[in-house]
């Protein structure tokens, strides 16, 4: 597995933060690094496999990667990212309490993926632009200023995650996307789901395609296939059981869709493990 080292990304040993833009981000194999990373999705779509678990990416996704996590990007489609790198929550010279504004693992569950709205993305652009420039010197005042901008960015993201579930259409669409991520195996009737999230059906179709590059049904099928691939790799369930557990009503149809998506059948994938 590829290991990325801070010495290759930070401008100096005293620099607390580094910015790496990916415009676009191509597929990148599984890796980990000796620093922390905040991945901010500005445009496009893709799949982020985080510690073996697949997450679909779209504009407004924010991913928090620790120094012991492993992750990769695949199936990228004009995926534009900004990566904010920092050494560790407790590695700043003038900041304390950074961990308060980061995801916290609870009972073995780490909420690594947040979502913010377009307004927050616009608000943080100037902060990211400031962080792109290394501190003017190693003087304490320059380091302190640089760290203070990072804290502003972190607080903006934290506030954006707390408030993005607003009652406007964008907020309700984000709620719907999160619901699909967590309930992909359930039978979905799009008119009923549109009513549930108070979205006109036409608006749901249009906005979801704008956010993900896929029709609603294609997006749901993709979620199910990604989860099925994860179970094929990490569980002992049979192919048939996995098909039903992931929301497919017919295992043969599941195998056909799986081969079309990943260029190999479920059984071929499992035989390679």
Swiss-Prot record:
Q: What is its main location?
A: cytoplasm
Entry's InterPro entries?
AraC-bd, AraC_XylS_family_regulators, Homeodomain-like_sf, HTH-like, HTH_AraC, HTH_AraC-typ_CS, RhaR_RhaS-like_N, RmlC-like_jellyroll
Question: Locate the HTH araC/xylS-type domain: which residues?
Answer: 174-272
Named from the GO MF annotations, one term is:
DNA-binding transcription factor activity
Localization in the cell: Cytoplasm
Q: Which GO terms describe its cellular component?
A: cytoplasm
Q: What is this protein called?
A: HTH-type transcriptional activator RhaS
**Protein's organism:** Yersinia pestis bv. Antiqua (strain Angola)
Phylogenetic classification of the source organism = Bacteria, Pseudomonadati, Pseudomonadota, Gammaproteobacteria, Enterobacterales
